[in-house]
Curated annotation (Swiss-Prot):
InterPro entries: SmpB (IPR023620), SsrA-bd_prot (IPR000037), SsrA-bd_prot_CS (IPR020081). Keywords: Cytoplasm, RNA-binding. It is found in: Cytoplasm. Residues 131-158 are annotated as: Disordered. Belongs to the SmpB family. GO terms for biological process: trans-translation. This is SsrA-binding protein. The keyword Metal-binding does not apply. The gene is smpB. Pfam families: SmpB. It comes from Brucella ovis (strain ATCC 25840 / 63/290 / NCTC 10512). The keyword Membrane does not apply. GO terms for cellular component: cytosol. GO terms for molecular function: RNA binding.
Length: 158
């Protein structure tokens, strides 16, 4: 049976939850990944970590650095290196826009989510972000605590 057209068919693999706390997210975009066969099999087994990774420009190309995709357990001598550089596939226009923002305005590009889209392709949701200062992080934490307290009070009252 076919899936309805409007249903989100994303199969989430990994999420960088600390990115929204450590960075102020300004813009997001979707990028493809150049992967080997054993990397895809390892991702299908929901094994990946993008918490400490970031994206960078080198030699006119866009690369994902420090992402961890463990070796495929059933793989043999053709297995991959777990922390290798992975090329990101974005359009030329998006790449130039990101490069200008990163080089001029002191921003960074961080991955938010790694998932398979509805066609079964591995995609990475990237964010153009600016690092938060310590006082901004404290303010975010206070807001989160207050929202939890409000929810607790309303739940107990009603």
């Amino acid at each position: 049976m076919n899936k309805p057209k409007n249903s989100p068919a994303r199969k989430m693999i990994a999420e960088n939850r600390k990115a929204r706390f450590n960075f102020e997210i300004l813009d997001t975009l979707e990028a493809g990944l150049v992967l080997t066969g054993t990397e895809v099999k390892s991702l299908r087994a929901n094994q990946a970590n993008i918490a400490e990774s970031y994206a960078s420009f080198e030699d006119g190309e866009f690369w994902l650095i420090n992402s961890y995709i463990p070796e495929y357990t059933q793989g043999n001598r053709f297995n991959h290196e777990p922390r290798r550089l992975r090329k990101l596939l974005v359009s030329r226009w998006e790449m130039s826009r990101l490069f200008n923002s990163v080089s001029r305005e002191g921003m960074t590009v961080v991955p938010l989510k790694l998932y398979f889209n509805d066609r079964g392709r591995a995609k990475l949701e990237l964010a153009l972000a600016r690092g938060k200062k310590t006082h901004d992080k404290r303010e975010t934490e206070k807001k989160r605590d207050w929202n939890r307290e409000k929810a607790r009070l309303l739940r107990d009252r009603g």
